[in-house]
């Protein structure tokens, strides 16, 4: 418990005959007794001076956190004018007056009503005054005094963070800085050791230590390995009172993580790996994966794989999967089981990031042996060449062998192979192949001038397994032979003037040859022997593949000979020599003195257009036939006369229209016959439905001839009654009223002709008197009457 003692504070009046106020206060034991005298004049202060009717006091000290049941006594105000008769009244104002601090207005005793906390407010400034109770006037000037709250150790140290997080590299040296923790104490640092904090470690030894005054945490153990332990939890205590017994304390937690360094080399879990790869594996295809283990993480665990040696150094490669840190073994070149079926490689795994500080731990790499077994697969035949080029002369006979392709089964079984030509590449079937030995031969004649290159594809397939096949292109070049005679470069037709002179050039000739000539074409020109002696012209070979035609005589007469045909023989210089005879047409024309053509005969005028005589005759015949056809067609059209629509103004025509009237249903196959109505005697039997077999057959009876004056309605009612009594069919037919067009015609309706009278007393001869318009009707009914009579 806390004990309290008294100390005296005196306030003196500085002049005689003046009253003075004495302020008394208690003091706590343990503090030396002190006495201060302050002289205040009015509201101002001056140390060790006197002033009329002034307050004299010292500052008060009050302990915080008072726990007693009574009010805590602070001090006492007293004036020398107070005679104890209750005439004076003491008033207190300022910080906490009336709330935290109260004063007995009669005695001047000051008390604290609540627990005070220095950490909330360390100093209170109050004002005191004594007044006359009766008049209310102050008997002393108002002055201030101070109450200071004395601190006690009632606050424990508080860390700035509840939890600290820190990290350091593994394998750090002893004394490596980790983190600094800080704790604060709310007590008065200037009073005693209440706010003096000392740090200590409660948990985390022997790995870490803390400096007692600064709170700096350092490593205390050498070579802490993250792979053994990564997380550490350290508890730090902060205690006030300089760490002495009885001081208050607080704790915090520090989570320390060891970060990784590259202190572990990669290691293969096994020294030898076995893989199998079919020989059909395409290049750049993976065949397996290997992985070296590294206890480090992140970039310190990154590994680069490489093939260092082995007989498959050029056949295989290895790459690193950056996500899984695995080595992917791939095929670089095509494998061949028959050539080599086992490869042995040495693979090395190396860290890409190496810390020089830990090189003493050994080389940061490891190696392993890889055995790759190549598996045999059924492969297609392989040709001896990737492509074949064959040259053949165009005059080679049919069925001649021009070349051979060869393919073999690369497998150990050496299956036999058959050959064929892909007909999509040889649609004309110019070539064929021996399926057994691959000999290619011609099946048709070749012509270099038609097609120089033939590109075909030959297929080689295993006989036992035709699906195993391969293809090879065969390029066949047709070589030229001299099988084409030279010919004129164009059609030559020229003219000669009647007044031409001898040895005059009238035309220059040139020739072409479809064949190739390795030494160049050399053509020779001459007049055919049979025409050389009688020719009116001469031919001069220019020795440059051209020739000139010259006149042999002076003057030509077109009336005697209008056209000359000059046969020219053209020969080449290749072997065998080819020659041809071409004809030059020469027209005789009239010319002026300068040699310009004025006129020729009709044929000569036509021919320059480029058309032959036969072509002109064919064109003329076509024109004549076309003209004759047009004339005949026009004549026939004019002879055809169209019947007039109306003969006269009184010509009135009625059209007989045929109507298909429904009413009997779809199964009623017996159509309504208007002819029967006109000729009642034609009704000679009873018509039954064709699609229904009647249950009771009855003999058809002959319908009686209609009586005189029987109209169409009576006849229809009779037929309707017969159909209604048919026991084998429902009543499909019903009475229908038929309307006939033609009302208003002078001849009235056709039905009236039949219904007015019977056949017995009706005479249709009067129809002939109605004119040509009723001739057809009169013929119809007139012939009917004649039939009756017969």
Swiss-Prot record:
Organism per entry: Gallus gallus (Chicken)
Residues bearing glycans: 165, 255, 437, 455, 536
Gene Ontology CC entries for this record: adherens junction; catenin complex; glutamatergic synapse; nucleoplasm
GO molecular function: beta-catenin binding; cadherin binding; calcium ion binding
Cytoplasmic-side positions: 637-790
Protein name according to UniProt: Cadherin-6
Signal peptide: 1-30
Stated role: Cadherins are calcium-dependent cell adhesion proteins. They preferentially interact with themselves in a homophilic manner in connecting cells; cadherins may thus contribute to the sorting of heterogeneous cell types.
